[in-house]
Amino acid sequence: ACITVKFNAMAEKSRYNYRVEPQDVDFTLRATIPSLGGSILNTAGIDAHGKGFGVDALNADNHSWVLSRMAVEFDCQPTQYTDYTVATWISDYGRVLSTRNFTLTDAAGREFGRAVTQWAMIDLQSRSAIDLSWVGDAHADAIVDAAPPTDKPRTIRAVSPTATAEHRVVYSDIDFNRHVNTMRY
């Protein structure tokens, strides 16, 4: 259940510009899903930082954001050197999860992708989730009165694997929260 907050008429979607660079493409010269996902996650971090609740601010209290769930849809993958914009906005804070939304548009303003992410705040020492009720109160002015661009992510149902693979974890697999890097799995 989400807390009730009054929407601030001044809160608007934030927009950040990107370009598909050579390191972001596959052999067809189209942006890879991990590179587009990376721009989505980078946008989340940049926007949170700009609003005063980025990882740097949270780390001072031994807290951090952790991506809990992510749902993405891409209609196409832009080609190398294509300029695009990622718009982001927060639609709600729940007790445990915050919902952040994204749309990706090309230079002509055509939407080609959308995402909804849900984030938990953790205590870095106990590694447990923190109640976000205070965040909704302290940062109600960051909430934008706009619907998510796609369905919120859901818990993945249990599967019975038919094959297994082993992967030895290496340095580059681990992020700053000491978790497996989001775009690796």
Where are these regions (language model features)?
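Terminal targeting signals and extreme-terminal segments of soluble enzymes
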Residues: 6-185
